[in-house]
A protein has these predicted regions:
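Noncatalytic partner-interaction/assembly domains of nucleic-acid and motor enzyme complexes
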Residues: 1-113
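Interdomain "pre-motor" coupling segment immediately N-terminal to P-loop NTPase/helicase cores
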Residues: 93-169
Length: 169
């Protein structure tokens, strides 16, 4: 079951920036990127290849590195090829905005948290409802709140809602 809580732009920006500057992965105290941040297998493969190649000592990541790395992983290589991975990586690396990496990283992590709640059956549409296209004011208010909220703010809001339900019954 795919989740509604996916920000494809954030995913592309994060992968594009890390592809261009894999040294971002060195800041483990600031950035923690995991498989859970990528609900789509193709994105997990692309990011995973970049991550492993850098972890294995490459200072720069190239399409050739990725192709070589995936060549010993036929299933991943097939998915990467089917999704035109090389073309996609070139496109997102050109579109990557390094100065906005923190924004997109935080957006990625917020979607991961909302997706985790959603996957466990917790309705978080009162925080962010990506399916709302009719109530423009509500949509903007939710976007504004989400942009300004931390992961802790989101977790606290969900915890408070669950606690209110617990106290009611």
């Amino acid at each position: 079951m795919s989740s509604r809580y996916v920000d494809t732009t954030a995913i592309m920006q994060v992968i594009g920036c890390v592809y261009n500057t894999p040294q971002l992965l060195d800041f483990t105290d600031k950035y923690t990127i995991t498989d859970e941040d990528f609900p789509d297998e193709f994105h997990r493969i692309a990011f995973g290849a970049i991550y492993k190649i850098y972890e294995l000592g490459a200072e720069n990541i190239t399409l050739e590195n990725i192709s070589d790395f995936l060549s010993s992983r036929p299933k991943s290589a097939a998915s990467f090829k089917q999704n035109k991975g090389e073309e996609w990586l070139l496109k997102i690396s050109d579109a990557a905005i390094p100065s906005a990496f923190d924004y997109y990283y935080n957006r990625l992590k917020k979607m991961t948290l909302l997706r985790a709640y959603d996957n466990y059956g917790v309705d978080v549409s009162y925080i962010y409802d990506p399916d709302n296209i009719l109530d423009v004011k509500k949509k903007q208010a939710q976007e504004d709140w989400l942009d300004n909220a931390t992961l802790e703010d989101i977790a606290t809001k969900v915890d408070n809602t669950i606690e209110a339900i617990r106290m009611k019954f």
